[in-house]
Amino acid sequence: MDEYAVVDGRGTMTVFETYIKTTPERLWEAITDSELRAKYSFGVQTESDYTNGSSYKSSVPGVIDIAEGENLEVDPPRRLVQSFTALWSDDVKSVGSSRVTWEIEPVGSSCRLRVIHDQLPDAANSELYGGWMMILSGLKTLLETGQLLDTPGSLRYARPGQVA
């Protein structure tokens, strides 16, 4: 299986899975800390208090709104389930809400991270889920090496000093 495997990309679900040399607590922090997340997620900051039923908003402040939704299930450092409404273009806005689930499982001295993007319409444009590979590659690189990964997405909204 490839490092990032699309386990099921048919119909209304896309699943990505990777193994990262880190602890569940550090991985949870990288997913939920706005400044840390911006380092591997195209400069996008996500603001939330990460409690069950709370809202979140993702954006590149002063540049573009990316997504918003609700934290449906918050179980640190194991599982985060969120509704996901994309905001970055009229095409993705018209799709409505989908769901993103982050599952963290310790495996020896590493973690398995599984990201499930589901409840997508059958005709969902890959623009909705096509960035996950770059985001997860950046997350893995940051946690394992402390370095930032240059990807087309990370360079798009990078601020000076944000990309190594």
What do these predicted ranges mean?
Residues 27-28, 37, 56, 71, ...:
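Hydrophobic pocket/interface hotspot
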Residues 1-47, 164:
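Hydrophobic ligand-binding cavity/cleft-lining segments
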Residues 141-151:
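Surface-exposed helix-capping loop/turn segments at secondary-structure junctions
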Residues 15-16, 34-70, 77-79, 151-162:
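Short beta-edge strand/loop motif at the mouth of beta-sheet-based domains
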Residues 17-18, 68-73, 98-105:
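Hydrophobic/aromatic beta-strand elements that line small-molecule binding cavities or substrate pockets
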